[in-house]
């Protein structure tokens, strides 16, 4: 009797589990330091400024950064977390402290992971900077995906379009018209160029208050923006793949930077596909802020806002109160949700 052929999902799951087992084995000696009370100093507050696979860098109130282990009881520790930690009396295997607890988060950004459920990216954010680029083309669908995440996380968003120096006058006009779609519904937008410096002063001023995070696909120029804003950091920049047009991942760990003019900036690894599997139809619908005024006024309570009679959203589109491109992207998201929704239960990222 021949063996049943594994599906692609089953093969990926086996490969992922195997990789995780190898990773745990390879790093077991690094992460399993048994810190005893007599090896540690007093409890103190700190902020996670870098998160690695098995360690985290914590900054104390005096600005000192210490590499720490994590207590095994901690479910999730991400950049931006306020933590309670203790400094070791000596350095062990390159580690000088241990994180004991994570303070309650004001907010967090999460994304679904097929194998690990909901995965936190960063915590305690004041604004999300959605970075897009004009090449290969400006994707409003991707921008809308990020905006749904921002709205569901209740975190203000700013749309930044990089590489404006590559635009012809005609293309610049087209991009400006696309950005007006978002300006009309209350989103702040910036058309910038890290290469020419266009509008970089406005971006720098925006970042000077609170903690911001750059999100966006690889290759949109997040590292180039950081090099401009923080030249001393010299973040590694990558070249676009000439074959696919997709960028190479150049940031391997999430990091928090302090800006000289004030404010903090978090840079996270680029993500080519920002899944929304953990959100249901109602959450995605609520992620479109211009829909809010019309929701609840459709003829039928279970209106899907597609071909339903008496749909207030469709009427608003026809009357020019909702942009048709946004409405089209909304249904693309709903369709993709129906096609790719995993049956697994997404556990909390806390």
Curated annotation (Swiss-Prot):
Biased composition (Basic residues): 21-30
EC number: 3.6.1.-
Stretch list, region Disordered: 1-30
PROSITE patterns noted in UniProt: ENGC_GTPASE (PS50936), G_CP (PS51721)
GO BP, one annotated term: ribosomal small subunit biogenesis
Binding site for GTP: 162-165, 216-224
Alphabetically ordered keywords of this record: Cytoplasm, GTP-binding, Hydrolase, Metal-binding, Nucleotide-binding, Ribosome biogenesis, RNA-binding, rRNA-binding, Zinc
GO molecular function annotation: GTP binding; GTPase activity; metal ion binding; rRNA binding
Annotated Gene3D superfamilies: Nucleic acid-binding proteins (2.40.50.140), P-loop containing nucleotide triphosphate hydrolases (3.40.50.300), Probable gtpase engc, domain 3 (1.10.40.50)
One of the Pfam families matching this protein, by short name: RsgA_GTPase
Biased composition regions of type Polar residues, renumbered to the chain: 7-20
GO cellular component annotations of the record: cytoplasm
Cofactor binding summary note: Binds 1 zinc ion per subunit.
Keyword field contains Hydrolase: yes
Necessary cofactors: Zn(2+)
Span of domain CP-type G: 106-274
Subcellular location: Cytoplasm
HAMAP family: GTPase_RsgA
Role this protein plays: One of several proteins that assist in the late maturation steps of the functional core of the 30S ribosomal subunit. Helps release RbfA from mature subunits. May play a role in the assembly of ribosomal proteins into the subunit. Circularly permuted GTPase that catalyzes slow GTP hydrolysis, GTPase activity is stimulated by the 30S ribosomal subunit.
Family from the record: Belongs to the TRAFAC class YlqF/YawG GTPase family. RsgA subfamily.
Subunit-level organization: Monomer. Associates with 30S ribosomal subunit, binds 16S rRNA.
Name of protein: Small ribosomal subunit biogenesis GTPase RsgA
Organism: Histophilus somni (strain 129Pt) (Haemophilus somnus)
